[in-house]
Amino acid sequence: MKKIYLCAISNIRSGACNEDCRFCTQSVRWGADINRYKEKSIETIVNEAKLAKNNRASGFCLVTSGKSLDEKTLEYVCSAAKAVLKEVDITLIACNGTADKESLKELKNAGIKIYNHNLETSREYYPKICSTHTWDERFQTCENIKSVGIRLCCGGIFGMGESNEDIQSFINSLKQLKPDGIPLNFFIENPKLPLKATHNKEFAINIVTRFANEFKEAIIMLAGGREIVFGNEWTEALRAGANSIVIGDYLTAKGEKPDKDLEILIKEGFEIADEC
């Protein structure tokens, strides 16, 4: 019986980003119609963590919009992490942009076990999807994460017009980092964003198979865009090599109802992991 890891996301600061990532609705430059707010209350975050635990999630990710983990964001995330861990037995993940070693050490001391920072795509293609910061800054953050003893979760977004060569270059870069987890996102179109999706189900299955074969020791996560590219046939991606999904909503896009995902997983014979 294949074991599947479930991860829930809490977008604790939404839509306040000045970067120009062409795939992201949280950038203020594109004017996407999303829910924007500065900070969720700590009480709300704790309640969401409890709900995630009830939905069998073994990981709970605290996500903030913006380029980097600045001092104010660091204080907020640490406070949220400590509050959650007082009441919920769950693995905490942070996703707060580029970060230096000292800030990451503080997160670790607050109870963060995993840090998610995606390279998104190849070094060569990155300038075509973002001009306000570099791919190298992202790679450096990933190295910082590993150097302080936090587990690295690092993946990308597919179907943004990248070539097969870009995907291979991206894989080669990930091999240097050896992440514990690799989220595979499939670009979600929005009428305000300047990109159009270049993916379909066959493409997505190929991506899953390719990454599962290249990274046999990593957790391969079906993340954003799962419902769009696979519809109700997303368990095919689990059989193709993925062993994790995001349960519940994404950052600004609605996900499937957790009870429906759980019902499908159990019905099709998958085991749900108790910890990650």
Map each language-model feature to its residues.
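Canonical Radical SAM [4Fe-4S] cluster-binding loop centered on the CxxxCxxC motif
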Residues: 6-44
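Conserved, mostly hydrophobic/aromatic
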Residues: 21, 62, 117, 145, ...
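Core AdoMet radical
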Residues: 28-48, 52-142, 151-155, 180-185
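A general structural detector for well-ordered alpha-helical segments in enzyme core domains, enriched
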Residues: 45-48, 76-84, 103, 137-142, ...
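Conserved strand-turn element in the central/C-terminal portion of the radical SAM core barrel
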Residues: 67-70, 141-165, 184-197, 219-229
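Anion (oxyanion) recognition and catalysis
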Residues: 85-86, 146, 266
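Catalytic cores of alpha/beta
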Residues: 99-109, 160-175, 227-240
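Auxiliary Fe-S-binding modules of radical SAM enzymes
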Residues: 172-276
